[in-house]
Amino acid sequence: MMHNRALRSFSKLARHDIRDWVLTGGLAIELRLGVEPASRPLNDIDFIVNAFDCIPRTLAGDLIFRHIHPFDPPGKTLLQSVDPDTALRIDVFRAYGATIRRASPMELPFGRFRVIALEDLVARAARLALDIAVGVPVPSKHARDFLRLVALVDPNQVETAWRDHRKPAHPATFDEANSLLHELIPARPDLLITPEYSKDTEAVCPRCAPTQAMHLADPNAVLGLLEYC
């Protein structure tokens, strides 16, 4: 059974033209793993799109916006919004390479929806977890998700997706990245952290660029809903 909050937010999103959106993030991970999504703590719903123009301006009638980044590159946040009725964050990211084309439809409680491919979820988790290779702390969920997901795939089938997701300094092949992470994750538990989110309502985001139809919410309103902003 899916979280009731998620169902309510998806029902709201269904009022808008989100045909170009692909579900990713924690919900997609649980769906691809064949696990009931309600078993995972739900803090946000993540999507990917190819361009900012894929985000309908009509969302302004149902959501409030914390970050609006029309010019962010692949992998980065285009929109961070909040459903004020469910206090769920709804994030939209710019997709890497051919990620959108590799997505496939799934029948979900809120209707038929495209979900990111398992191979892309593995490649994305590997990209994020590999920060520990250079001594940078990483949210522990990325390492945990990587280990759960990679156990279900043939590493050879991830190579194409890996070329889209890897950073320039990362191993050239997924096989190498996979081996490296299986060494690093158990060796560096000190770098696997639980992140703390900002509560600074005075902070100014240099990447935000509100549009005529989409305006930034009062940070205090976001803080009241999420307990961070």
What is the predicted function of each stretch?
Residues 1-229:
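Compositionally biased terminal segments of proteins
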